[in-house]
Swiss-Prot record:
Native source species: Oryzias latipes
Upper taxonomic lineage: Eukaryota, Metazoa, Chordata, Craniata, Vertebrata
UniProt keyword terms in alphabetical order: ATP-binding, Membrane, Mitochondrion, Mitochondrion inner membrane, Nucleotide-binding, Transit peptide, Transmembrane, Transmembrane helix, Transport
Gene from which the chain derives: abcb7
Membrane-spanning parts: 134-154, 177-199, 253-273, 284-304, 376-396, 403-423
Sequence similarity: Belongs to the ABC transporter superfamily. ABCB family. Heavy Metal importer (TC 3.A.1.210) subfamily.
Role noted for this protein: Exports glutathione-coordinated iron-sulfur clusters such as [2Fe-2S]-(GS)4 cluster from the mitochondria to the cytosol in an ATP-dependent manner allowing the assembly of the cytosolic iron-sulfur (Fe/S) cluster-containing proteins and participates in iron homeostasis. May play a role in iron and lipid metabolism.
Organelle targeting sequence: 1-19
A molecular function GO annotation: ATP binding
GO CC term (a single one): mitochondrion
Topology term for the membrane: Multi-pass membrane protein
Name recorded for this polypeptide: Iron-sulfur clusters transporter ABCB7, mitochondrial
């Protein structure tokens, strides 16, 4: 359709402009004019411009002065914000839903995250996992005790070798005794180190099942919860960013679980244990230096890590945006190719990568600063405590073995301390990563079923549908359904037609309870759908959608998805009913043929046939058909409709139609207009009604056929016979041309 020209006038007399914009035809636009200025005063005016007829001179002026007009448009675009006025919402349309996840998701406090994680580590319904946790803690205690014994064994070995404090080694006195004691102590030293390592590895082995089970349960709960959220959430989410956040959060679970149970708590315990030993064996000065060093180390680590957290947040944000941009671009591969925008997409993706690179460099440089500060603090503390030990040896209060013991105790803490810094840093970052994961679990769905809701009792014989004064709006103040009432008798075929945005597809979504009407009630078999369980409700409904989206798997999997318990023979049978079986067998891999991302390797007709077949396989009492052939050619549409006729025989069915020729055999046709049922009746009755909206729609779609009939002089029966013969020949030629290629609807 030809583009239309719209004149926008700023209504201030002092400064009046006329801007001519080339805009695609649509219903209406809201235009916010931000450029109206009079004596320094800003005015904002909202106007609605209907795009109707155009003055021919304006159209002519566009072609004669194209360059100047283009410049004016670019200048005007800086001052105008054009927003499509919508009264409905379709998932693949250009409208906007005010459900930004940034506004919906509220962050969960870290304490709540830790509390929730502990409930997975110590589950009430898994005594076997609780036993594993108890055994792991016992092994941890054994590892710490044997670890503390190592410096003492080293001390006793040195003291045995150096029998007199402050003197050189004297091995002439009782050499056999010294050798025996030294050997025993050194063996004890080796056993202590090996025992500590053994306890640690056994602990990791026993606790591994606990950690992996927790990860599995959390990930499954998040996945299931996402499927239980309402459609509004999923229409507003960003798939790339969400998948990145879930992936990072899941990876962080294992680290945080191990860190909390086996690193942070035990390391703090070991710090106080070492300080107590130093106080008891060496005096208060040693304990004070040790506690001071450890406290300074911990405080420095916490403060710097908290400061560094913002760089990790920036890095995660850039990572999310880069992932989302990549997925969005790859999903729209064909569109990118249509407009030769590969370089633009690469540059856009690289822009996000630059942000990630900048944030990552900040994270790396601040990590180097943190590591150096930790090493400096520990080195100062170690030097101070060694000086105190040297003074004690010089004064005769301590032995060389005491010096070795003090050095060993503090050095043994260096590893968990260094790891403590890493653990705290990574735990903080993991908690940030896990925030979205646990926040998703806190998102509450707007569609809820009642407690102990009974299942929907429905059979094909009593499968009635009744809308009772239903009002619904996606956005406040813009009603899509405005008091709709109708009934579909059991076993009847009812069609719903109307213009774009009249609420046809909304009726399907309300039946599935993807949304809840603001007013009114919906009944199936006399039962209010709000009073029955969601699972039983959706089990009773089958749908052939307008856009049949398939899983990235083989054809058999996508067919069997209608009933995952169906046998292969049942799958083959529904494929035959949908006219798909022979075409599949002609494909190189038959039913194992991969359909590609969202089924893009199949034609539109093949995807629709798969959708029909799996709807047949589901075998629901009620079938919904949502404009499934609106984008297909006439022959493919006719073949699909032939498949559908057998399927809906003696079954309650609702056909939402764009092409009226597909619903002429409906028992009743409902015509929606402005959110209400404007007309109802059979096809012929509506055509015979003077001035009916349905007749107007029918005549508009069939104007070419009607004109050709008026100009023809052949008898009606002869013309129909000739047309039928031509149609059959054309269909036969098409089928022969694709024979062997596997495409049943070229």
């Amino acid at each position: 359709m030809a583009p239309m020209l719209v004149s926008l006038n700023c209504g201030i007399r002092v400064q009046r402009r006329t801007l001519t914009l080339l805009i695609r035809q649509t219903s209406s636009y809201h235009i916010w004019d931000k450029s109206c200025i009079n004596n320094g005063t800003n005015y904002q005016r909202r106007r609605t411009y209907a795009l109707n007829s155009l003055h021919p001179q304006r159209t002519a002026s566009w072609s004669t002065n194209r360059t100047e007009n283009r410049r004016q448009i670019l200048e005007a675009a800086k001052h105008l914000q054009v927003t499509d006025k919508r009264t409905c919402w379709h998932g693949n349309a250009g409208g906007r839903l005010n459900a930004d996840p940034k506004n919906v998701l509220k962050e969960v406090h870290s304490a709540k995250i830790l509390s929730a994680m502990l409930s997975y580590v110590w589950p009430k319904d898994r005594p076997d996992l609780r036993a594993r946790v108890a055994v792991s803690l016992g092994l941890l205690a054994g590892a710490k005790l044997t670890n503390v014994m190592v410096p003492f064994m080293f001390k006793y070995a040195v003291d045995e070798l150096n029998q007199m404090s402050g003197h050189m080694l004297n091995l002439n006195d009782a050499p056999s005794t010294v050798a025996t004691m030294t050997t025993a102590v050194l063996i004890g030293y080796g056993v202590s180190r090996a025992g500590s390592a053994l306890f640690n590895e056994l602990r990791n082995t026993v606790f591994g099942k606990v950690a992996q089970s927790s990860i599995r349960r959390i990930a499954k709960n998040v996945f299931l919860h996402l499927h239980n959220l309402d459609l509004g959430f999923h229409l507003s989410r960003q798939t790339g960013a969400l998948s990145k956040a879930i992936d990072r959060g899941t990876r962080g679970i294992s680290f945080v679980l191990s860190a909390l149970v086996f690193n942070l708590g035990p390391t703090v315990f070991e710090m106080f244990l070492v300080s107590a030993i130093l106080y008891y064996k060496c005096g208060g000065e040693f304990a004070a230096v040790a506690l001071g060093t450890l406290s300074a180390y911990t405080i420095f680590t916490i403060l710097v890590t908290q400061w560094r957290t913002r760089f990790r947040i920036e890095m995660n944000k850039a990572d999310n945006e880069a992932g989302n941009a990549a997925i969005d671009s790859l999903l729209n591969y064909e569109t990118v190719k249509y407009f030769n925008n590969e370089k633009y997409e690469a540059e856009r993706y690289d822009g996000y990568l630059k942000l990630y690179e900048s944030s990552s460099l900040k994270t790396t440089s601040t990590l180097a600063m943190l590591n150096f500060g930790q090493s400096a603090i520990f080195s100062v503390g170690l030097t101070a405590i060694m000086l105190l030990a040297s003074k004690g040896i010089a004064a005769g209060n301590m032995t060389v073995g005491d010096l070795v013991m003090v050095n060993g105790l503090l050095f043994q803490l260096s590893l968990p301390l260094n790891f403590l810094g890493t653990v705290y840093r990574e735990t903080r970052q993991a908690l940030i990563d896990m925030n979205t994961l646990f926040t998703l679990l806190n998102v509450d769905t707007k569609i809820k079923e009642k407690d102990l809701a009974p299942p929907l009792a429905v059979t094909p014989q009593d499968a009635t549908i009744r809308f009772e004064d239903v009002y619904f709006e996606y956005m406040e103040g813009q009603k899509v359904l405005n008091g709709v009432s109708f009934e579909v008798p059991a076993g009847k075929k009812v069609a719903i037609v109307g213009g774009s945005g009249s609420g046809k597809s909304t009726i399907v979504r309300l039946l599935f309870r993807f949304y809840e009407p603001q007013q009114g009630n919906i009944y199936i078999s006399g039962q209010n759908i709000r009073d029955v369980s969601l699972e039983s409700l959706r089990k009773a409904l089958g749908v052939v959608p307008q856009d049949a989206v398939l899983f990235h798997n083989n054809i058999f999997y996508n067919l069997q998805y209608g009933n995952i318990n169906a046998t292969p023979e049942e799958v083959y049978q529904v494929a035959r009913l949908a006219g798909l079986h022979d075409a599949i067998l002609r494909m190189p891999h038959g039913y194992d043929t991969q359909v590609g991302e969202r089924g893009l390797k199949l034609s539109g007709g093949e995807k629709q046939r798969v959708a029909i077949a799996r709807a047949i396989l589901k075998n629901p009492p009620i079938l919904l058909y949502d404009e499934a052939t609106s984008s297909l050619d006439s022959i493919t549409e006719e073949n699909i409709m032939t498949s559908m006729k057998e399927m809906v025989k003696d079954r309650t069915s609702v056909f939402i139609a764009h092409r009226l020729s597909t619903i002429v055999d409906a028992d009743e046709i409902l015509v929606l207009s402005q959110g209400k049922v404007a007309e109802r009746g059979t096809h012929q009755a509506l055509l015979d009604t003077p001035g009916s909206l349905y007749a107007e729609l029918w005549n508009a779609q069939n104007s070419k056929i009607l004109n050709s009939r008026k100009s023809s002089s052949a008898p009606a029966a002869e013309r129909l016979s000739q047309k039928e013969e031509e149609r059959k020949k054309l269909q036969e030629e098409i089928l022969n041309s694709v024979k062997g290629c596997g495409n049943c609807s070229c």
